[in-house]
Amino acid sequence: MTDYINKKERKRDPSFDYAKLSDEVAERAKEGLIEEKGFFIPPSALFCNALKNAPSNEDLNVTLQNIFNEIEKSSLGTPSEENVKGLFADLEVNSNKLGSSHKNRVEKLTKILQAIGGMQLGDYLKSGIDVFGDAYEYLMAMYASNAGKSGGEFFTPQEVSELLAKITLHNQESINKVYDPCCGSGSLLLQFSKVLGDKNVSKGYFGQETNLTTYNLCRINMFLHDINYSKFHIAHGDTLSDPKHEDDKPFDAIVSNPPYSTKWDSNSLLKDDERFKKANVLAPKNAADLAFTMHMLSYLSNSGTAAIVEFPGVLYRGNAEAKIRECLVKENVIDCVIALPNNLFFGTSIATCILVLKKNKKDDTTLFIDASKEFVKEGKKNKLKACNREKILQTYIERKEVKHFCALANIEKIQENDYNLSVNRYVEQEDTKEAIDIKALNSEISQIVEKQSALRNRLESIIKELEA
């Protein structure tokens, strides 16, 4: 907020600094700021001032709680109320985890503020959102992991997020709206702001998240990335049993990294749900992967593209999942299957894949890309570097077969493979074994046999001499 206000005011007065104003003076601009940004923070409550006063503030926890309460209170009765309501519900400044006594908690909070203040993030408005955004999202993933959740459910690496966004955009320079039914921290949605610029996502960002803590973190993430409250629509709830964006569909771009093979309430009544009835079968109770896939297909516009990170088991598992794959293949909506390298995601080392869906395919072919070797090792993790992402993206766009890397298969060929969509069924693996020269091998064997014969004759000769 400080940067936003200073940027405007310094056009008139280059020395203006919102952080140095009195709360009474700043109050005059409160109504306008709430209308523009969705909330109001007086100068005394800004992070820089809270940090400066922290060492001498014996009731820092009370001060911080009051700041959070006042920010939320400032939005009451305004259009931004729903996007600010409960935003800080999970921030427990009086938690015993911070210390057993009031004094210990205040000391720990002071150290936390000082640690954040000391981070070399720079002015993220000048350097771009990546540094600040990545740091925030990584911290969220760490929080989720320590809370006993899979980091992959909360944090999709930036390089994977970018690839998904660019696949759905397919060189478009603008888009209507984007949707993620399992939005986690919002990192996938925010990639569209990075790739296109926020002004080129005309109707905004739509998402749903079942975990309350992560839902709040996602909304904070939107505000921190300077997405206006009027442009993001993040809902809390179970996407499969209680979808919140029915009235907002269809979407031109859908991206998601749903939880892998999670349990869900596959009530038999859902068979008649518009999202699932085409397959005439529901995804297994212990593996909701393809339920999310069918949900996204239902919400996709006729000219749109969905790019979904999937657990590879959905490509080959049998029974209900095989029937759902059969439905997807016969409906001719599977545009591409991309096998990714293993160990890409935070909190898991499994190899994943990307399933790309389209309703307006030009023919009945599906492109299979084996990108399992497209990575660079960095520390303990594998990374999709810019060259890897570009190779995958261009291969997807050009749709030309490349030996040992990608192949096209029509519906008939996929049917011959019993609707198995595993990439290695269609992309021939390169034989990396050393070629054997049979002629040279036979010559070598002959030489060995001759040598053995000579040695045997010599041994027999020695024995005869000894016997004599």
What are these regions (language model features)?
Residues 242, 246-468:
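A conserved structural/catalytic subdomain of Rossmann-like adenosyl-cofactor enzymes
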Residues 1-163, 167-168, 230-239, 339-343, ...:
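Non-catalytic, mostly N-terminal accessory regions of nucleic-acid modification and defense proteins
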Residues 2-6, 121, 140-144, 197, ...:
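Non-catalytic alpha-helical coupling and interface elements of nucleotide-dependent molecular machines
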Residues 150-256, 261-263, 267-270, 275-279, ...:
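Conserved S-adenosyl-L-methionine
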